[in-house]
Every structure is written in C-alpha cells, then in structure tokens.
C-alpha cells in the first residue's frame, strides 16, 4: 500500500488508516461490480470531534476525486481520505468479518469524536477536549457521560467549570466521588487556571443511575 497526496498541498499529518486484507478483498469485489474503471472509495468523518461524529465511506469515481484528498493505493482499488478528517481517523481500522449470514464491514475510529485543540484554544475548548478524550471513555463503562455547560468567572471562587452528567451518572450515589476524585482532579491538573468544578445535574432523576 502506498500513501500520497493527490494535490500539491503540504501534508500536516499523514493518514495511518488501516484497511485490513479481508476488508480490501470485500471492497475490491464490491467495486468491481460497479463496472467503472478506476473507481475507489472515499473515506471521511461527518461532524468530526463531536459526540455526533460519524465515519463514512462512499464510492469515488475518477472524475469525482477531490484534489485535496490523500490517496492510499491498494492492490485492487484506491482509497481517498478527506484531508480535514485525517486527524480524526488516527488509528482507525476498517475490517470485514465473515459470519454465517455473509459478513459485516466494520469501521472503528477511536479518535473520531475527540476534539482537536491547539495552543490558542479557549479554556472551554480545552475542557471539552479533556472530557471527550480522557473522562468520558471511563464514564462510558457505567453508561455515563459528562459535558461542559459553561465556564464562569466567579469573583469569589475564580474560574469555575459547570458540568452536567448524563446516562448512568445521573442520579448516581457515587457522583461526588467521581466529580472530586476523578473529573475535578484531572481538569485542574491539566488546566491550572481552573479553580473549581461544579455539578449542575439534577440527580433526583435516578432511573438509569449506575449506583443508587
């Protein structure tokens, strides 16, 4: 497999997306049935860096190629990767698993929902990045999640992050431990200017709580 930019633009990041041999075979057979010489697939992420991120794949005929895309050449077909999606496809794997019903194409992209933050990112963007990349993966094991509501500049307490918990965290009896020992500690270690973290969740609604 070779990777190249189909345009003359300088690459900030090179794709490391993996299409497994079984997925290559499946896609190659599928593309052959389209009767279009040179047809490939285009891979991109809709709503990248958000909880609504969705990894997508579409047919890409030669006359439909976006000149800014990155081309990964496989033995039977080319794959074109949307350049802005590359950071969100880091460590992504497209695989095909055969079963008694035929098989299923799977697309795992662990970084598709993780926001990207640069050195000039706002404190809101930095908090959201940490929540999405470090906090929520742990809470997901209990069916929970956490989101930033706002950052307040409190005259008495300084910069305060207001959070809201959902899923299995809402109404959970262990939420104070989760907030103080987990979320607040992690956020304040990485964002020193943050003075306080508070919970705005209505925990009287405990129907789906992990601990009651």
UniProtKB/Swiss-Prot annotation:
Chain's role: Involved in iron-sulfur cluster biogenesis. Binds a 4Fe-4S cluster, can transfer this cluster to apoproteins, and thereby intervenes in the maturation of Fe/S proteins. Could also act as a scaffold/chaperone for damaged Fe/S proteins.
Gene3D superfamilies, sorted: Fe-S cluster assembly (FSCA), HesB-like domain
Protein name: Fe/S biogenesis protein NfuA
Assembly behavior: Homodimer.
Species of provenance: Acinetobacter baylyi (strain ATCC 33305 / BD413 / ADP1)
Binding locations of [4Fe-4S] cluster: 169, 172
Taxonomic superkingdom: Bacteria
GO molecular function: 4 iron, 4 sulfur cluster binding; iron ion binding
Database matches in PANTHER family: FE_S BIOGENESIS PROTEIN NFUA, IRON-SULFUR CLUSTER SCAFFOLD PROTEIN NFU-RELATED
């Amino acid at each position: 497999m070779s990777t190249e930019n189909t345009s003359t633009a300088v690459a900030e990041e090179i794709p490391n997306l993996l299409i497994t041999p079984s997925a290559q075979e499946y896609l190659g057979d599928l593309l052959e049935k389209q009767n279009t010489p040179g047809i490939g697939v285009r891979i991109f992420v809709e709503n990248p860096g958000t909880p609504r991120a969705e990894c997508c794949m579409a047919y890409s005929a030669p006359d439909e190629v976006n000149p800014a895309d990155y081309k990964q050449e496989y033995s039977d077909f080319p794959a074109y990767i949307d350049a802005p999606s590359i950071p969100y496809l880091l460590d992504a794997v497209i695989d095909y698993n055969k079963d008694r019903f035929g098989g299923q194409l799977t697309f795992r992209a662990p970084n598709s929902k993780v926001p990207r933050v640069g050195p000039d990112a706002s404190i809101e963007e930095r908090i959201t990045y940490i929540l999405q990349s470090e906090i929520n993966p742990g809470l997901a094991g209990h069916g929970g999640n956490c989101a930033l509501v706002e950052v307040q500049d409190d005259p008495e307490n300084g910069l305060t992050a207001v959070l809201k918990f959902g899923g299995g965290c809402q109404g959970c009896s262990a939420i104070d431990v989760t907030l103080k020992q987990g979320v607040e500690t992690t956020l304040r270690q990485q964002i020193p200017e943050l003075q306080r973290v508070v919970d705005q969740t209505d925990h009287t609604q405990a129907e789906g709580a992990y601990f009651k």
